[in-house]
């Protein structure tokens, strides 16, 4: 027997799938348009009832914000985060709930490293491995894809490029620029350098990070790179054209304009020679690669895997990126996800049964689809699968909290 659930937080009629019976245990409106629902479901092939905890909201609600949270101190050299219980988020104003983040690698007893990409406030904490992830957009929206960070490159004549070696400091390489982007800052051009002023604030919103890379279309030497842009194999690349409005020699003092950026480059190097040629050309602009289409407004990213539902179709076989234990958990375990319905609602969702039992990933994907998912991505499962709501005991598979490095949060303002 299938129970139809007629509320704004669930489909008016369940789609076909493995749920044989669905009952609402409780429902609470936590903020206007934001609903917490506890369901209990009987799923075919499983003897125990599955508890479903769901926080849903209307995508486009300007009061709602999704984000990545680091639960402890970040250690840049190792790219690790000190682990803490998800309840350590506390109860700051506006926090409505959270679920655990990406799979993570144990490095020490107190610090873990996220497996996938981790970005918060346009700062890259983990570059990840190029696998699935979700980018958080304004108004409770999100974009699921396979984001990666590629260096921002200034396109110079003769098919050469320059990278951004530093913000507010001199670059390390001759094929790099140092970007001074704080409006009103007075930059004194040091000996051996030249300055170029561009009429663009693009540098102020670039992804910032720290990675040593080689630029094969530059000097092809290992150098620290500080500025990046989102790339995604499923999204079109973009280019930005930045007008060059002035150049200044060593000894000059240049004020960073309100709508511009000052770039410093070593005299005689690839970057300086190329920018000088562009500045003297009939069309003094320099092109850079921007964020992939749909990613420019993404502030935070949380890695996850796999994409459980895509285009309204649940996955039907184990992807190569998912190991057999993650796929089955020995018969089933607790599982979290972020999902979007065809009716335009987003949900943080956690599903599991008593004593840590739960669903296989295949069944989980089918259940999400039956609950209306048009798109969904999973995060770390089993003992790490948790949901937290301020003022409530965390929902966990074993009755206690794991210590975790990251979480996805839902806030209301």
Language model: regions and residue ranges:
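Gly/Ser/Thr/Pro-rich low-complexity, intrinsically disordered segments
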Residues: 11-413
């Amino acid at each position: 027997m299938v129970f139809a659930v007629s509320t704004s937080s669930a489909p008016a009629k369940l789609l076909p799938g493995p749920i044989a019976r669905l009952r609402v245990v409780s429902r609470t409106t936590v903020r206007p348009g934001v609903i917490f629902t506890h369901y209990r479901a009987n799923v075919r092939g499983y003897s125990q009832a599955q508890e479903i905890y769901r926080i849903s909201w209307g995508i486009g609600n300007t009061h709602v914000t999704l984000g990545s949270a680091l639960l402890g101190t970040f250690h840049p050299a190792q790219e690790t985060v000190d682990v803490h219980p998800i309840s350590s988020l506390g109860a700051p104003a506006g926090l409505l709930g959270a679920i655990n983040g990406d799979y993570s690698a144990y490095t020490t007893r107190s610090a873990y490293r996220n497996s996938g990409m981790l970005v918060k406030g346009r700062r890259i904490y983990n570059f990840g491995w190029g696998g699935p992830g979700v980018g958080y957009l304004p108004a409770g929206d999100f974009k699921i894809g396979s984001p990666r960070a590629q260096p921002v490159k200034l396109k110079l004549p003769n098919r050469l490029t320059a990278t951004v070696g530093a913000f507010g400091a001199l670059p390390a390489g001759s094929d790099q620029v140092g970007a001074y982007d704080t409006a009103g800052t007075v930059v004194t051009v040091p000996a051996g350098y030249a300055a170029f002023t561009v009429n663009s604030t693009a540098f102020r919103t670039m992804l910032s990070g720290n990675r040593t890379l080689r630029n094969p279309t530059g000097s092809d030497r290992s150098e620290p790179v500080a500025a990046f842009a989102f790339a995604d194999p499923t999204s079109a690349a973009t280019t930005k054209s930045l007008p060059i409005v002035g150049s200044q020699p060593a000894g000059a003092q240049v004020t960073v304009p309100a709508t511009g950026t000052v770039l410093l480059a070593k005299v005689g190097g690839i970057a300086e020679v190329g920018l000088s040629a562009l500045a003297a050309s009939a069309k003094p602009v320099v092109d850079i690669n921007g964020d992939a289409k749909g990613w420019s407004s993404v502030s935070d990213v949380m890695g996850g895997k796999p994409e459980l539902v895509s285009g309204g179709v649940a996955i039907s076989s184990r992807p190569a990126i998912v190991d057999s234990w993650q796929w089955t958990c020995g018969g089933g375990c607790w599982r979290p996800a972020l999902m979007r319905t065809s009716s335009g609602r987003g949900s943080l969702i956690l599903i599991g049964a008593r004593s840590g039992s739960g669903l296989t990933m295949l069944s989980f994907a089918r259940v999400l689809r039956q609950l209306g998912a048009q798109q969904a991505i999973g995060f770390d499962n089993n003992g790490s699968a948790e949901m937290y709501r301020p003022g409530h005991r965390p929902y966990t598979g074993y009755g206690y909290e794991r210590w975790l490095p990251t979480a996805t949060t839902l806030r209301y303002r």
